[in-house]
Amino acid sequence: MAWAPLLLTLLSLLTASLGASVTLTCTLSSGYSNYKVDWYQQRPGKGPRFVMRVGTGGIVGSKGDGIPDRFSVLGSGLNRYLTIKNIQEEDESDYHCGADHGSGSNFV
C-alpha cells in the first residue's frame, strides 16, 4: 500500500477578543489519523515554545513548562485542536503544529 506524504494544514490567521475563546485546527493528510501532533507557541522575536502533544485521545504526556490550564487539546479523526479559553494579551503569538513521522518532521 502506498502512502501519501504527510501534510499538515493550519489556518493562517485568526483573531480573538480578550476574554474570548478560540480553537485552532491542525489537519493531517488522509492516512495519518493515528499520528500525534505537537503544538508550539512562538512570540515575536522568540523561539518556538512547546505547548503540548495531542493524539486522537487528547493530550499525550504533559503540557509545556508554564502553559496555563486555559490551554487544552483534543484529537478527532484527522484533526488536532488547540483551544485557548479566556484569551489574554500574553497569548498573542504565532501557533504552529508539527508531526514527527519517523523519516523527518513536518511543521506549519
Place the predicted regions along the sequence by residue.
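Extracellular domains of the immunoglobulin superfamily
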Residues: 1-108
